[in-house]
């Protein structure tokens, strides 16, 4: 009677699987720390003329908006534009920071697709 080949899992495959689980655990632990770190950050965005400042967390949670009196004098439509500019700037900086931190977290782990 011929011997079966089993499931095709040799010792090498088991070791690879263990390494993959360890990497996943490292990423999970690092992601939790990163989430906490991003939550504590305050990232500022500014309008083109600097009269409006928006502060967001590293997780893109809005924290505050500061509007200089000169911006109020420009009227509702211009003020809306300035607030939008500041929000976009803060959001862009926040997502760039998050992306950079994620790259730091996953660098050296040799994860496919990252």
From Swiss-Prot:
Function: Binds to DNA and alters its conformation. May be involved in regulation of gene expression, nucleoid organization and DNA protection.
The organism's place on the tree of life at top rank: Bacteria
One cellular component (GO) term of this entry: bacterial nucleoid
InterPro entries for this protein: YbaB-like_sf, YbaB/EbfC
Disulphide linkage map: none
Family classification: Belongs to the YbaB/EbfC family.
GO MF term set: DNA binding
Keyword terms, alphabetized: Cytoplasm, DNA-binding
Oligomeric form and interacting partners: Homodimer.
Compartments in which it is found: Cytoplasm, Nucleoid
Main location: cytoplasm
Protein name, as recorded: Nucleoid-associated protein PCC7424_2224
């Amino acid at each position: 009677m011929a011997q079966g080949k089993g499931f095709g899992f040799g010792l090498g495959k088991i070791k690879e699987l263990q390494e993959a689980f360890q990497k996943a655990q490292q990423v999970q632990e690092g992601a939790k720390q990163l989430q906490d770190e991003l939550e504590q950050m305050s990232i500022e965005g500014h309008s083109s003329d600097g009269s409006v400042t928006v502060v967001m967390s590293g997780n893109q949670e809005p924290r505050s908006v500061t509007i200089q009196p000169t911006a109020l004098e420009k009227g509702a439509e211009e003020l809306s534009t300035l607030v939008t500019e500041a929000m976009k700037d803060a959001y862009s900086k926040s997502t760039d920071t998050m992306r950079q931190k994620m790259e730091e977290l996953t660098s050296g782990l040799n994860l496919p697709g990252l």
